[in-house]
Structure formats: structure tokens, C-alpha cells
Amino acid sequence: MNHTDTSPIKLRKNWNAREMQALFDERAGRTDPRIYTDEDLYQIELERVFGRSWLLLGHETQIKKPGDYTTNYMGEDPVLVVRQKDGSIAVFLNQCRHRGMRICRSDAGNAKAFTCSYHGWAYDTAGNLVNVPFEAESFPCLDKKEWSPLKARVATYKGLIFANWDHDAPDLDTYLGEAKFYMDHMLDRTEAGTEAIPGVQKWVIPCNWKLAAEQFCWDAYHAATTAHLSGILAGLPDGVELADLAPPTVGKQYRAPWGGHGSGFFIGEPDLLLAIMGPKITSYWTEGPASEKAAQRLGSVERGSKLTVEHMTVFPTCSFLLGANTVRTWHPRGPNEVEVWAFTVVDADAPDDIKEEFRRQTVRTFSAGGVFEQDDGENWVEIQHVLRGHKARSRPFNAEMSMGQTIDDDPVYPGRISNVYSDEAARGFYAQWLRMMTSSDWAALNATR
């Protein structure tokens, strides 16, 4: 049995910008495999990618009432996400300023304050230090305003909660850019918006976080192989044979001109959605009042009912799969491990039986034990296992597919558009990764636009 050692591969003490520039060659379509294994590159990622990007932290319906909270991560930093009395959301480092203990150790709940279990320092729901045991006797000069946890910027987009440590970063709306157009296919089908089905699934995969994030960014290509055959066979409704389903061929891929976001989608071919989610979800998505409402709201029948399956990554680690409606964050856990946090969203005004069907089918397909999820994870794990070898890390990976075949003036879809089977969005993903890794701050990043 293959065993993937998740200990980091230590190759060098540091990287300079010139050396990092050689890790990805967009013009040639070449990626250096060391980006998936090197510990020092990973530490730079934590600072320059995860410390400066807008990161997904959940859905607003997961914290409905004042005091409702969830615990989450931004990179490897634990954070608290808390609904405030005025309806706003606060995000702050889940770390007591006294000795660094985690302030809150629960996954979710409702609280009026948070008290560190080590020495009892207490913080309000906005992250302000409000009480210190024996303050008068032992801390006569303590300025509590100076000893609150680090607070992040918070913004939402149509129900999704994002946060950013960098106060010089562009606002979320600017950061997303035309990616919002593609996010709306899942998030804005109805004026009621979306809601998260209760529960977050969490599991660990021994692979680099970029392998997972980039697949959701560009890779419809793997769906044309036999990798998911077992999952398709398991989900076929009665009376439908595998031979009856045509492989999808009509679709497009989106790459953000700048920013690293990417998406791929199929148009007018419901067979793939039928194979993944079954007839009930397929019917809800492609015909009847819900699809008509979506077509009207999104501006075209193509976007409302014929765009049946879409994969997307908002750089760096927010990914979702429209149709299955799984939303996830790829939390890095060193260069050789990622922790997946996934939940399911549905139209808030969908009938209860449709919501239940989304829950049931997503658990069956894209969850910790999902039949499709396991196939994807097996590929990523095996790649990481192979990269333990010195020779395996010494030759570049190919990212040439559909190079030079993109357009910037599609009449319907904004951004850089190519055929659905393309590496274009992957090239955009790694181009943004490289910009962030080699830029000292957001001023330098903005200069590369």
C-alpha cells in the first residue's frame, strides 16, 4: 500500500523573487512541481497569499442571531466569526493576547462573551478585551484597548462571508471583479438568495492545497475520463443506461484577466447533471418556475436553465460546484496536506423536498465519503506521493492546453474566455499566485495589473 509522508520536504532556507519567478512560465505553459512540496515556499504563501487575500469563512445564514458564532481559519490562523448586535459580522484572531491560548474551542454556538480557559481573560463578541482577573491587583496599568486580538476586514457577497487581514487590499467587490457574474449562477437565481444547509463537513487530504483549488478553477478535462464512472453508475435513475448519456462537449471556461479566479461550465447538456444529482435536481434546475425565475433574474435562458454544471475557484481557496451546490474552503496544513471544509447552499425559497434532495445528493457525491469526491482526492494524494521523489520534482508540469485560443470579447461572458477543456484558468491561477509570492505589498501587486 502506498503511504504518503506528509512531513515537509526541506530543500532550501529561502527563496528570492528572481528564483520564484522561474517557478511558473505562463508563456511556455510550464509549472515547477516544487511549488507543491517546498516548506519555505509554503511559509511565504502563508504570509503573502493567505495574509493578503479575501478568504471564504462561511455563509451568513450560519450565524443568524446576535452572538451566533463559528470558528474557522484564515490560512493556518484560527479565527472567530461572530454576528454583532447591529447585524454586522466581526472576524478576529482566535488567540488570547495573554499567553496565546485559543479563546474559543467550540465549532459553533451563541455567546455573549468569550473567556480564555487558561487564565480567564475575557473578550466581547467584537473581539475587545473586557475583563482580566485580578486586574486591579496585578495589572494596574493595563490598557485593554491595546490587548485585543487582531481583527480582520469583513465583507459579504450575496450570502458568502469573506475576510482579509490586509487593510491595504482592494475591497471585496473590486477583488472579485467579473467573477461575480459567474458566482451569481449559484448565488443569485432568486430574489430570496441562498441559505446554507446546516452542517459543515471537514476532512483532511494528504496533498497540497493548490492541487484541489486549481482543479475547481479549470479542470472539466478530467470529467471526460473514466475516473468518475463508479459514481455515475451509482447515481443513475431507474430506466437510464450509461450508454444513454452523452459526454458533455459544449461549454466555456472563464479566466479572470487579473486576480486568479477561474471557472468552467457546460451549456445545454443536462446529462452530466442528471448523472451527478439525479432527475429531481435536474428538473428543478432546467425546467419549471425556478429555472424561469433564474433566467429572468440572470438575464438569459442560457444562464438560467441551460448552464447546468459549473466549477469555480475564487482565488485562492474558495471553490464551489454549481449543480451539486457544494461550497468549500481548502485550508492549508503544510505543503503536503489540506483540510477541506464544505457545506451546501440552496435557493432560500426552494421547496423543502428540493432542499432535502440537495442535501442527500451532495452527501452521496461531493462530501467526505462522496463517490466523486473520493476519485478526485485519490488523484491528488497520488500526485503528492509521487512528488516525494527527487526526479519527480525535477521536471516541469505541462499547462499548454488551448494556449492562444482565448478571446476577451465574448458577447455573453466577461473575462478571458476559452473552450471548456483548457488550461487557461489554471495559467491565470498560477500567474496570480506568482504575483502575490513575489510582490512585497498590495501597491506592488496593483502595479502588475
Swiss-Prot record:
Reaction catalyzed: chlorobenzene + NADH + O2 + H(+) = (1R,2R)-3-chlorocyclohexa-3,5-diene-1,2-diol + NAD(+)
Name of this chain's protein: Chlorobenzene dioxygenase subunit alpha
Entry note: cofactor: Binds 1 [2Fe-2S] cluster per subunit. Binds 1 Fe cation per subunit.
Involved pathway(s): Aromatic compound metabolism
Function: Part of the oxygenase component of the chlorobenzene dioxygenase system that catalyzes the dihydroxylation of a range of aromatic compounds, including chlorinated benzenes and toluenes, and dinuclear aromatics such as biphenyl and dibenzo-p-dioxin. The alpha subunit is responsible for substrate specificity.
Family under the similarity heading: Belongs to the bacterial ring-hydroxylating dioxygenase alpha subunit family.
Co-factor requirement: [2Fe-2S] cluster; Fe cation
Residues that coordinate or bind [2Fe-2S] cluster: 96, 98, 116, 119
One MF term in the entry's GO annotations: dioxygenase activity
Cross-referenced Pfam families: Rieske, Ring_hydroxyl_A
All copies of domain Rieske, residue ranges: 54-163
Recorded name of the encoding gene: tecA1
EC number: 1.14.12.26
Assembly and interaction partners: This dioxygenase system consists of four proteins: the two subunits of the oxygenase component (TecA1 and TecA2), a ferredoxin (TecA3) and a ferredoxin reductase (TecA4).
GO biological process, alphabetically ordered: catabolic process
The keyword Transcription regulation is annotated on this UniProt entry: no
Keyword entries, A-Z: 2Fe-2S, Aromatic hydrocarbons catabolism, Dioxygenase, Iron, Iron-sulfur, Metal-binding, NAD, Oxidoreductase
Residues that, per the record, bind Fe cation: 222, 228, 376
InterPro entries cross-referenced by the UniProt entry: RHO_NdoB-like_C, Rieske_2Fe-2S, Rieske_2Fe-2S_sf, Ring-hydroxy_dOase_2Fe2S_BS, Ring_hydroxy_dOase_asu_C_dom, Rng_hydr_dOase-A
